[in-house]
């Protein structure tokens, strides 16, 4: 049975022809463990004043804003190509939203309200400001933001810009990242919403299933009927969609080392060692991986992953940060003023 795509921050292998466990960057599943020891929600360092937790945040120069930014301005070429193919089918976008949006959003709304903390100007206000700022930079309406208790660093969204779009972040992710890094994560999830990845990737999955199913026959193992080449192409699209959203993260962070640091910490970071991690060494590691993986065995290891490996994502965003495409976007941007930042 095909299910809706949830887009998340971590990396995993999935079956694109079934999506029974749904796409979340994987380290954190929506139904994952919630029994871990409580974690403090906040950025380093955390100070207590009058019995309330105060979050100490780090300021940065006023960021650039992309006022007329369109999703296709930063889409990965493969993501753009496949999305255009589906957009060309009359009525498919509207049908997809009608089928996938309202009921699923309502279910997820109840899940989030019942199990997480809803961020607002009165609840974790610094996180609220970070989301508002990131959404403004990417020219998208700010979704609801929830913080959920989990020992697994992750963030995810229902990647449909419907009536109640949302982003969920785990407490352990907040503990692991700096303010700028966490905002880059929020931007990555906003990228999924801006690109409507939930609509297009789920529709691609459903169309693939429909093309290779036989009416009246048992449908439980449709992924087995899905040709190998088709599965590989879907995986390639999934990986390209993640690279698209890493670009959205860079547009908000406006410093490639911030995005690369997020990927490095998700690959092998912890709060106690965060200050010892080296972004340049991680990029050198990516170059070493390129050499080691340029073989049939290396290709076989990655072609059925739904998310690019973290070292490859780091290399890709480093290269895109030096591209004419990125520089062109920066030239179009304007400075965010103080009023907009509030």
What name fits each language-model region?
Residues 189-218, 256-257:
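Catalytic Zn2+-binding segment of zinc metalloproteases
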Residues 244-253, 262, 301-315, 319:
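Active-site-proximal alpha-helical
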Residues 123-126, 134, 138-140, 215-291:
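Short helix/loop segments within enzyme catalytic domains
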Residues 131, 169, 188, 245, ...:
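Residue-level signature of catalytic and energy-coupling elements of molecular machines
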Residues 167, 193, 317-320, 324:
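TPR/TPR-like alpha-solenoid repeats
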Residues 2-163, 227, 231-234, 238, ...:
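Hydrophobic or amphipathic, alpha-helical segments that drive membrane association/targeting
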Residues 122, 126, 168-185, 233-239:
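Short pre-active-site segment immediately N-terminal to the catalytic Zn-binding motif
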Residues 137, 143-145, 151-183, 190, ...:
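Active-site scaffold of zinc-dependent metalloenzymes
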């Amino acid at each position: 049975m095909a299910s809706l795509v949830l887009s998340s921050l971590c990396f995993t292998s999935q079956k694109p022809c079934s999506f029974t466990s749904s796409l979340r960057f994987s380290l954190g599943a929506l139904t994952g463990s919630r029994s871990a020891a409580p974690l403090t929600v906040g950025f380093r360092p955390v100070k207590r004043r009058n019995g309330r937790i105060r979050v100490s945040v780090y300021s940065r120069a006023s960021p650039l804003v992309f006022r007329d930014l369109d999703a296709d301005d930063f889409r990965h070429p493969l993501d753009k190509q496949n999305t255009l193919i589906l957009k060309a089918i009359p009525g498919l976008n509207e049908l997809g939203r009608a089928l996938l949006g309202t009921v699923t959003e309502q279910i997820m709304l109840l899940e989030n309200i019942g199990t997480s903390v809803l961020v607002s100007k009165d609840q974790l206000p610094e996180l609220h400001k970070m989301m508002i700022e990131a959404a403004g930079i990417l020219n998208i309406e700010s979704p609801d933001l929830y913080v959920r208790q989990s020992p697994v660093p992750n963030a995810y969204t229902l990647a449909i810009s419907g009536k109640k779009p949302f982003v969920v972040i785990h407490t352990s992710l907040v503990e692991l990242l700096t303010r700028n890094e966490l905002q880059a994560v929020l931007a990555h999830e906003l990228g999924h919403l801006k690109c409507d990845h939930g609509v297009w990737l789920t529709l691609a999955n459903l169309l693939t299933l429909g093309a290779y199913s036989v009416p009246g026959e048992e449908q439980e193992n449709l992924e087995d009927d899905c040709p190998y080449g088709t599965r590989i192409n879907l995986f390639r699209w999934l990986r390209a969609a993640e690279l698209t959203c890493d670009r959205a993260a860079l547009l908000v962070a406006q410093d490639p080392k911030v995005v690369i640091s997020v990927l490095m910490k998700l690959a092998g970071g912890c709060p106690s060692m965060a200050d010892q991690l080296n972004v340049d060494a991680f990029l050198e590691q990516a170059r070493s991986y390129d050499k080691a993986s340029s073989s049939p065995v290396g290709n076989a290891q990655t072609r059925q992953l739904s998310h690019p490996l973290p070292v490859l994502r780091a290399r890709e965003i480093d290269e895109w940060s030096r591209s004419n495409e990125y520089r062109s976007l920066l030239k179009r941007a304007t400075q965010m003023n103080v009023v907009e930042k509030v």
